[in-house]
Amino acid sequence: MIEVENLSFSYGRRKSKVLEDFSMKLDKGSVYGLLGKNGTGKSTLLYLMAGLLRPQTGNVLYKGVDVKKRYPDTLQDMFLVPEEFALPNVSLKQYVKLNAPFYPNFSDELLNACLRDFDMNEDIHL
């Protein structure tokens, strides 16, 4: 479960807040959509929820733990794919070998099943 409590955030010295006293609760096992116009704070909220930004006020709790603390046990369950990102110049196999240890719940079997579903193999280059 993710709980957002009275979250307020603004970038730099901007007077207008991107989020102000925002609260919500997301239950485990549910699927949610985040809709809004460009520049209304959707990405900012996701970065706050992942602990990558710090709010001016309020808290984000993931399984009861404040995400600002960035505990490894908390981070191993979190995945955030930004809108734009750079992939390293390695094969998928190399990428998995380097990063899978950080995610104890990572499943080679599930990855291989997904690759088969899309007629791909782990030797593809990122």
Regions found by a protein language model. Give the residues of each.
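ABC-family P-loop ATPase nucleotide-binding domains
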Residues: 82-126
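Conserved A-loop
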Residues: 10-14, 62, 103
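Helix-to-loop junction immediately C-terminal to a conserved catalytic motif
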Residues: 50
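The feature captures the beta-strand-to-loop junction immediately N-terminal to the Walker
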Residues: 32-37
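Conserved ABC transporter NBD signature motif
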Residues: 58-69, 73-74
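A position-specific signal in ABC ATPase nucleotide-binding domains
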Residues: 12, 53-55
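A short, flexible loop at the N-terminus of ABC-type nucleotide-binding domains that lies
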Residues: 1-21, 28
